[in-house]
């Protein structure tokens, strides 16, 4: 600013000097006319000279203004250039996906992964050892272990023969190597699941917290770390379970376009590994995807056929004997059983009801959750709320199975996304404050409890038992019932949502049609 003022003063001084000099020169050059009177000697010339001086002064002032304007424009241009210069980037900013904000998210995921790999090298992981020994039994033949009779760490092989064939490569690995392999797979799938969730959210124009600061890959790393730290994924890693693989197969089948390969192929393979994914046939049925249902049946039948073709004796044993023996999986009242049967036995109802009466209650609650799920799928399908469709069907699957351990619920991230971003916006647009508050309390308590896991909840509500004594917590106690309370609260939340839908059916249907039209328009505009 000081430079501008000095320039301005200099221009004004020069202009004043020029105008004075021009005036003096004009007066000196005025001619003297001999025959004119003395009083009028300079009169005829003075008026034009004064006029000329005024014009020149005006011209000088105009040039000063022009110079000032040019100087200001030059300064403004220099300032703009300075501002337009890109800020100096740090080393991490030059790496794709490593913005300074995202760096912390990447580091968090790396720390979670390092902790997981360090943990599994020092802690027991029973399930992966069962898978490995199942593969060893096939490799050793009739003279070695028998697939459905051996036990390792007290646990038998409970999966179909097709699963044992897929586990066959584990026979060439040691127990620690197999554990590290399954942990690496879980690590990759947690990141892939986070990528799918974030991409799905962006395609629906959802704004997520910290999205502006972390960027795309920073958000993916943060979501992946949070997924891996939740109760179901922690325990899946602890046991070396295949639940993340089952999730990946089903997600890949439903999130891909069903073009050349019809939907249902991967779902059938998942059911061939573990029977419970057959429950997703209800989703195909409510979509009226007859081709998908046929493909699911054919794919599942192919896995059964491969089992009979390769290991006939083991297949006969499983399909005609082992599949009916639920005691091979565990006992119903185990603290980690989150199914309907687990809820009933945790409450100790088996001691107050006959076996028949207990079965009637279980069947009634099973039919209720199946009916409610089928009804709620209608508006969710119409609104193309895919996360909610998958999450609701997965919850039904966990509930109707006689035994569902909490680590089977690797669907938790989808449940959280579905409740917050699809079910509430679609179903709870115009409800009373009481109903809305009730739904928020039920959903929040359920989702927070699922994240923690039954193990820690049981210990929190059982002050006289420690971790080594958790199996001694008695049936019917508050501590044992509290462990699976989050799943009971989610069941109640779904029932409340069901009645809200029935009471506001037309409004929900209009909202579903609007959501469908908006997604169709967005897809067309792309």
Which residues are covered by each model-predicted region?
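Membrane-interface alpha helices of multi-pass inner-membrane proteins
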Residues: 262-285, 393-400
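Hydrophobic transmembrane alpha-helices
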Residues: 174, 189, 274-277, 415
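Aromatic-enriched
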Residues: 420-526
């Amino acid at each position: 600013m000081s430079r501008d003022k000095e320039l301005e003063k200099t221009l004004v001084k020069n202009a004043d000097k020029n105008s004075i000099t021009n005036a003096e020169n004009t007066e000196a050059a005025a001619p003297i006319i001999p025959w004119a009177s003395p009083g009028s000697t300079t009169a005829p010339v003075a008026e034009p000279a004064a006029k000329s001086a005024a014009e020149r002064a005006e011209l000088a002032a105009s040039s000063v203004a022009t110079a000032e304007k040019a100087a200001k424009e030059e300064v403004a241009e220099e300032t703009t250039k300075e501002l337009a210069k890109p800020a100096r980037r740090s080393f991490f900013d030059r790496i794709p996906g490593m913005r300074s904000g995202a760096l912390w998210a990447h580091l968090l995921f790396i720390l979670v992964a390092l902790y997981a790999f360090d943990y599994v090298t020092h802690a027991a992981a029973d399930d992966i050892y069962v898978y490995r020994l199942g593969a060893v039994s096939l490799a050793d033949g009739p003279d070695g272990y028998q697939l459905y009779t051996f036990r390792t760490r007290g646990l038998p092989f409970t999966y179909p023969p097709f699963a044992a064939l897929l586990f066959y490569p584990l026979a060439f690995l040691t127990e620690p190597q197999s554990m590290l392999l399954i942990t690496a797979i879980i690590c990759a799938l947690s990141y892939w699941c986070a990528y799918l969730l974030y991409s799905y959210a962006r395609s629906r124009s959802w704004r997520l917290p910290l999205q502006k600061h972390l960027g795309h890959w920073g958000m993916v790393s943060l979501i992946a770390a949070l997924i891996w730290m939740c109760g179901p994924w922690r325990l899946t890693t602890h046991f070396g379970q295949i639940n993340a693989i089952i999730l990946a197969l089903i997600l890949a089948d439903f999130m891909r376009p069903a073009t050349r390969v019809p939907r249902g192929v991967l779902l059938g393979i998942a059911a061939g590994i573990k029977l419970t994914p057959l429950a997703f046939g209800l989703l195909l049925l409510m979509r009226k995807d007859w081709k998908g249902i046929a493909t699911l049946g054919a794919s599942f039948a192919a896995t059964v056929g491969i089992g009979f073709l390769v290991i006939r004796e083991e297949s006969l044993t499983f399909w005609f004997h082992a599949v009916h023996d639920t005691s091979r999986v565990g006992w119903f009242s185990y603290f980690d059983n989150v199914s309907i049967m687990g809820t009933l036995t945790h409450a100790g109802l088996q001691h107050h009801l006959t076996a028949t009466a207990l079965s009637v209650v279980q069947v009634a609650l099973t039919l209720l959750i199946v009916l409610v799920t089928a009804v709620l799928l209608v508006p969710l399908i119409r609104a193309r709320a895919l996360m909610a469709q998958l999450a609701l069907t997965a919850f039904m699957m966990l509930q109707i199975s006689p035994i569902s351990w909490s680590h089977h619920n690797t669907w938790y991230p989808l449940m959280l996304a579905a409740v917050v971003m699809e079910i509430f916006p679609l179903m709870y647009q115009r409800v009373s404050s009481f109903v809305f508050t009730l739904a928020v309390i039920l959903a929040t308590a359920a989702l927070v409890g699922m994240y923690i896991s039954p193990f820690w909840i049981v210990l929190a509500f059982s002050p006289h038992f420690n971790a080594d004594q958790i199996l001694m917590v008695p049936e019917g106690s508050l501590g044992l019932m509290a462990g699976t309370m989050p799943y009971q609260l989610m069941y109640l939340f779904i029932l409340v949502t069901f009645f809200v839908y029935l009471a506001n059916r037309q409004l929900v249907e209009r909202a579903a049609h609007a959501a469908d039209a908006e997604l169709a328009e967005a897809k067309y505009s792309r």
